[in-house]
C-alpha cells in the first residue's frame, strides 16, 4: 500500500503499485495528457513505471526544465526510428541531448545530403502524426545483447558489453524501432511537435580518431512552435552576424589552408586588435599589474616539471634542435613562475601580479577549428597573481571589479557567474580547500552578485570562478576566469619568506578577462554585427570631396583630425559622392565628412553618421567635440543593429 505525497503535501493511499500516469489521471485529464514523466523521491522515471513504496512525487510536464530535456531525448529516438525506416542498413550509435536540441551518430554507407535531411524530417512528422505510445521494457544486459545482436546494431552491442551484468537496461520502443537509454522518455509521440533537423557533420565513434567516422545529424526541439520559430529566427540572425562572413565583408581577417587555425589579420582587423590590447593594458595597470614577456619555445623539461607534458603532450606543438626537445608554449603559467622565482621574495612583496599578452599554440583537431572562435594560435590576456592564503579573497574581489569594468565598457551588462568547487580527485589539504572556497564565495557575496554553485567541477588543483557574458542574441560566452592553484607553485619550487622567516609556497591565481583576443574579437564582431562603437572602429571618419578641386581641403581636414588622435581616411576616387556615401555607410564607418565648394569657402565640413543622420555643417573643432563624446560612450553607445 504505497502512500504517495504530492508537492503540496497532499497524500494519496493506494492498495497496490501505481504509476505516474494513473496518479495524473486521478488529478485531472489535463494533467494526464500533459504528463511526460515523474520525479519519484528525487529520481526521474517514466509515467508507466510502477511505484511500489511510499514516495514523494512530482509530475513532470513540458513547463518544467526537465520536461524539455525529455522531449529532446525522445526526439533523438524518433530520429532513429525515421532513419531506420528510410535507410534500413544504417547502424545507430548514440543520440544524446545537447544545448538547444539533440543529435544522433549514425553509420551509413552513403553521405547524408540536405535532401536526405528533409526526407528524414518529413518521415519524423509522419510518425508523430500516428500518435503512437512509446513503450519501455526493463531488461538485463544479456537480454539487451540478444535484441541488438538480432538487429545487427554493432554500436549498441559495444555499449552493452561495458555495462555490468547486475545492472538493468531500459529498452524504448517506437513501434518496430528499439533503442536503449536511461530515460525517461515521453509516453506518446503527441508530445513531439516542434522540431527541425539542422545539419550533418562527422564524428568519430567514442571520439577516437582510430575508430570509424560516423555521420552526426543535429536537430533542435522546443516545447512549442512559437519557441521553435523564435529559435530559428535567432539562428538566422546569428548566421548573418557570423564573424567569418563579416570578417571578409569588412576586410578584418582571413584564414587559409596553408595555416589552419592561424589568423591573417588585415590592417582594419589588426587596428581593432591593437585598440583592444591597449585598452586592457591601460585598465590592468590601474590594478597594479606588471607586464612581462616570456619565451615562445621552452625545453620539455619545464613542461614535465609543471605536469603539462604528461597531460597535454598530444595538444602541444613540439620541435627538436641540437638533440633537445622543445614545446611551443600552450600556456604561460610555468614561465611566469620562472619570473617569480628570480630573486628572494618576502611576504611583504605579495601579492605580485604578473600579466602577459602571451601568444600560445595548441594542436586543436582540424575539425574543431572555427574562425576566430577556435584557433591553434591565440593570445591570452593572461595574468598570474602570487599571494598568501589570506590574500585570496581580496584579490578575487579586485578581479571581479576589473572584469565588470571591462565587460561594461563593451556594453555587456548580463554576466553569469559560476563557482566550481573541489572534485573527488584533488591535491591540497581540506583546510586549504575550505579557505579557498570560502574566500571565493565570500568575494562574490561581498559584491552582491548572483552566482551558481557547481559542486565537484573545480580543477584538481583548486576552485575557480567563471564569468560568462550574454550577447545581443542571448548567447552565452564563457570568457573570464579566476582559478586558484595550490599545485603548480609547489611543483616549480616557488617560495617566499613569511613573517616568521620560514620559506612558504605562495598560492597562484590564474586569471583571464577576455580569454583570448581572437575569440573575444569574434564575439565583438558578431555582437556589434560589424557596427563597432566609435572608439573601436578601425576607421572612425571617412572624408570625401565632391569634386577634384576639393581634394586639398580633404587632405587638410584629415591632417587636423589625425593630429587630434582620430583614425581618418580620405576617398578621392573619381566617383559620385552619393555612391561613396552609400559604400562607406555599408562599411559601417561611424562618421562621414563631405567637403564641397561651399564647405571649403566657409572653412566647414558637412557631417553625416552611418545611421544616415545629417548633422549639418560645422567647423572641425566643433566636430571634434561630437566625436569625443561618441568615443567616451564606448560600449554604452552599443549600436548592435
Curated annotation (Swiss-Prot):
Protein's cellular compartments: Cytoplasm
Record-level GO BP terms: threonyl-tRNA aminoacylation
Gene Ontology MF annotations: ATP binding; metal ion binding; threonine-tRNA ligase activity; tRNA binding
SUPFAM superfamilies xref list: Class II aaRS ABD-related, Class II aaRS and biotin synthetases, TGS-like, ThrRS/AlaRS common domain
Catalytic, as annotated region: 242-533
Reactions catalysed, as given in the entry: tRNA(Thr) + L-threonine + ATP = L-threonyl-tRNA(Thr) + AMP + diphosphate + H(+)
PROSITE patterns: AA_TRNA_LIGASE_II, TGS
The keyword Lipoprotein is annotated on this UniProt entry: no
GO cellular component: cytosol
UniProt keyword annotations, A-Z: Aminoacyl-tRNA synthetase, ATP-binding, Cytoplasm, Ligase, Metal-binding, Nucleotide-binding, Protein biosynthesis, RNA-binding, tRNA-binding, Zinc
Domain TGS stretches: 1-61
Cofactor note as given: Binds 1 zinc ion per subunit.
Enzyme Commission code: 6.1.1.3
Domain of life: Bacteria
Residue positions binding Zn(2+): 333, 384, 510
Main location: cytoplasm
Cofactor(s) named in the record: Zn(2+)
Oligomer and partners: Homodimer.
Entry function: Catalyzes the attachment of threonine to tRNA(Thr) in a two-step reaction: L-threonine is first activated by ATP to form Thr-AMP and then transferred to the acceptor end of tRNA(Thr). Also edits incorrectly charged L-seryl-tRNA(Thr).
Family: Belongs to the class-II aminoacyl-tRNA synthetase family.
Protein name, entry field: Threonine--tRNA ligase
Species for this entry: Prochlorococcus marinus (strain NATL2A)
UniProt lineage: Bacteria, Bacillati, Cyanobacteriota, Cyanophyceae, Synechococcales
Gene name tied to this protein: thrS
